UniProtKB/Swiss-Prot annotation:
The keyword Amino-acid biosynthesis applies. Belongs to the peptidase M20A family. DapE subfamily. It comes from Histophilus somni (strain 129Pt). Homodimer. This is Succinyl-diaminopimelate desuccinylase.
Amino acid sequence: MKNNIITLTQSLIQRPSISPDDQGCQQLIAERLQAVGFKLEWLPFGDTLNLWATHGEGKCIAFAGHTDVVPIGNESQWTYLPFEARIVENMLYGRGAADMKGALAAMVIAAETFVKHLPNHQGKIALLITSDEEAAATNGTVKVVETLIKRNEKIDYCVVGEPSSATQFGDIIKNGRRGSITGNLYIQGVQGHVAYPHLADNPVHNALKFLDELTHYQWDKGNEFFPPTSLQIANIHAGTGSNNVIPGELYVQFNLRYCTEVTDEIIKTKVTEMLEKHKLTYRIDWNLSGKPFLTPQGKLVNATLEAVEKFTQIRPHLDTGGGTSDARFIATMGAEVVEFGPLNQTIHKVNECVNIDDLAKCGEIYYHILEKLFNEQ
């Protein structure tokens, strides 16, 4: 499988698929899958292309990934051209090499090879591929999941090929993620001259005690799977830029990464209580990016642990840290979900790269997961 994985990865990297422009990546994948009998369904939404490819019937094991990449930044800082896909000393360089065209290629080749060997396999193998993960993530996996739910089509197990490894390939499997919710808070005051404060009402001064309470509040203590919920102020703005004008409004944007000990409703209620307690005039808009999810040790987690250990000779650690991913959408279907892929040390950076031996092992691991899960059905 190694040569096929590397060749496909290079072909994908050579297509400059800056989110959400797929640039023909999914068509390349679709042709391979169709050649071995996969049924293809194109699910475009807005400016996003999505592919749902399936083979077989029964319990569904899905591989999920994205063809889109982040912008390259300053091209002159790259040692090798970002869309050239050059291999130097066993490292494949290019935007998307690690996040996540390499793992995507490994998934495709693993599924293709499995179907060639076992065309009448048990269950259903699926690939869910989107071009909208790195940017808005509004017309990609979330829309495909909504479509599948509407027609009662189920995903039982899902492996997302995000680059989960931290310091050594295979050291981490993600079996959950924290939730993410953002508050956009507008606190009203009365604008005026700084020399006449009695004729104005400074929203910055009024909000200080509230902000102190908000940033020091302990939401929970976490649990055995998640660290404690954390809140960070991301942006804050008030005033006109002049030193003699009391601002009429204060804008505060804050984000919480929250564990399973709280819910988004608990968070909203508590923040509202604080605002009312401090008698502020305000408007708050909430944006829920994703709810927390956890896949406990069971068939998928155990199969992934076994496969990674077999091909890396290390025992991976189960982890729920980091940001959000498309796994959060798939988890809403009741699926067991894990994320596993190459090292994440160079993702989104200049000179993004991946070890080609790691990609080959990725393919072997994904193949072994298929074998293990189908044998247990």
